[in-house]
Amino acid sequence: GENISDADMQQAADIAQATEFIDSKVDRYNSLISQGGTNVSGGQKQRLSIARAIAKHPKIYLFDDSFSALDYKTDLTLRKELSKQTADATVIIVAQRISTILHADNILVLDEGKIVGSGTHEELLASCETYQEIAKSQLSEAELAGVEKGGRA
């Protein structure tokens, strides 16, 4: 494996919101994770994977449904901290939850493998029927109203 300093790994764990559960383990950063991660929860496994990616400081990050097992608060905090760390990198997020990609610079909407929309959240709410349907099924009326007025939901 790569040589990642303890400080870089701890910073990555902080960003990935993994520090609390790592610190709760007897061996902390030296704890063994079973094959397939069966001794950690789905959300913990995702946060460990995200921390490993962050610690490597790549120029391109690809998160493929990496936030799906996280609760809303953890997802929001993690993405906020992640955006600070990845300001000079390209970040590609594959997601099914609109809340995960709400503030992305550009969102591609796929329907049956074809791109049916491209733009910001606000642009897609105004122009893409598929995105509108997804947004209405996932976001509350208050979130839709707040976002449509340029607020942060």
PLM segments and residue spans:
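Catalytic Walker B motif of ABC-type/P-loop ATPase nucleotide-binding domains
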Residues: Y61-D64
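ABC ATPase nucleotide-binding domain "signature" region
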Residues: S41-G42, L48-A53, T77, I93
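A short, proline-enriched helix->beta-strand linker immediately N-terminal to the Walker B motif
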Residues: A55-K59, D88
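C-terminal portion of ABC ATPase nucleotide-binding domains
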Residues: A7, I15, D23-R28, K80, ...
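Conserved catalytic loops of ABC-family nucleotide-binding domains
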Residues: K84-A95
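ABC-fold ATPase nucleotide-binding domain signature/coupling loops
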Residues: T19-L48, S66, L70-K73, E141-A153
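ABC-type ATPase nucleotide-binding domains, specifically the catalytic core motifs of the NBD
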Residues: G1-D6
